[in-house]
Amino acid sequence: MATMLEAASFIKTLELLKESDTPFPIYNNDKVRLIIGGIGKTNSAMATAHFIEKYRPICICNTGAAGSTNNEYVLGETYHIKKIIEPDRPDLKTGIPCEQIPHILSGFPLAVLSTRDAPVHDIEDRANISKMAGLADMEGAAVNQVCSHFKTRCFLFKFVSDTPEHMSNREIIRNIKLYSNTFSEFFCISVMPRLLESASCEL
C-alpha cells in the first residue's frame, strides 16, 4: 500500500505486527505481509522489487484508494482492476499509452485503472483520463510491472476515495478515513480467502 492512512485499517483488522522499518515499513502475521511503499511510481517500484527479492511471495495485491474519473464509480465502492493504462508513459513507437493486464479473480466488479505520477485534480484532466479509464491512482502500474518482471502474480483492488465532485485534498483524506475500514473488511472477508485457497499469499 502507498500510505499509512490507507494501511492502518488493514494493520488493525489483520492484527499485523511491525516486522521492519527500513528501507520500507513492513507488517506481518502468520499468513500475510503488508509493505507501505510510498506515493508514486518510483516508490512503488522500489518497494515491490525489495519485497519480492526479500520474501519471494507467491502473489502480491496492490490495494488502496483511487479516484473516479467519472460518476459511474461510486464513492466508497471497491473495484477489481482488469487493465492498467499509463497516460504519462506512451509507447515509443506508437505514442499510445502503455497498457498492462494484471491477474484477475472472478466474481468482483471490474474497472480500468489509469496510473500516473501526477494526481488528478483538474476537472478537464479528469475528463480526458475518463476516456481511457474509470479509476486513477499513482502506484498500480508500477507494482504490476515489477511483478511481471519477476514473474510474480499481481492482483489490484481499489476503493473509490474521490469523484469529480470530491477533488480537494481535505475531502480525499476524509473519504479515505471514512471508507478504509469497510474496504479492509471487504478484502479480508471476500478477497483474501480466495488468494489463500492453495497457499499463503503476500499482501
Question: What kind of feature is each model-predicted range?
Answer:
Residues 1-19:
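N-terminal beta1-alpha1 ligand-phosphate binding loop
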Residues 23-203:
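Glycine-rich phosphate- or other oxyanion-binding loops that anchor nucleotides, phosphorylated ligands
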